[in-house]
Amino acid sequence: FEGDRIKAVREMIVSKTAAQRRVALEKILPMQRSDFEGIYEAMEGLPVTIRYLDPPLHEFLPTNSYDITQLAKDMHIGLDELKSVISSLHEFNPMMGHRGCRLAISYPEIAEMQTTAVIQAALAVNERHPDWKIEPEIMIPLVGDVAELRYVKKVVCEVADKLIQESEFDMKYHVGTMIEIP
């Protein structure tokens, strides 16, 4: 991520409330939608699997003093408060940590935004290229229990079904998982 992208992702990560997170996600949505449209266009109708946000959140946060100070200013929060957030997000064992499907369980608005981007991108490309008949394939990462998958799949399907119903197109999509048990 560069420039405005990393700034919006960092804003999403350090948000304290769902409302703050949704503001950041609204900035990320058009970026992801555009990226997914580009992928669908490049693949010219071939299957595409989109893996949802997976890395531990601390990997997106700044590590040097200048960037930490700048993020605190951009977010209008105290430097010590931001350092505390960064410290709290660092994970000793990231495979067992707060990432992948567990992130979508804690913050379903992230999965909602990613689903919106995936489905809107596929609908837009299908409109331009109806012969491609794109069927998005969504991968929920780092699933270790069926209950995790059920929860996140419900979030994904509710958003996808609503967007498809509101469109002029009948489009299929698939939701799968990467099962990872350390």
PLM region spans:
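Conserved alpha/beta-domain cores
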Residues: 1-182
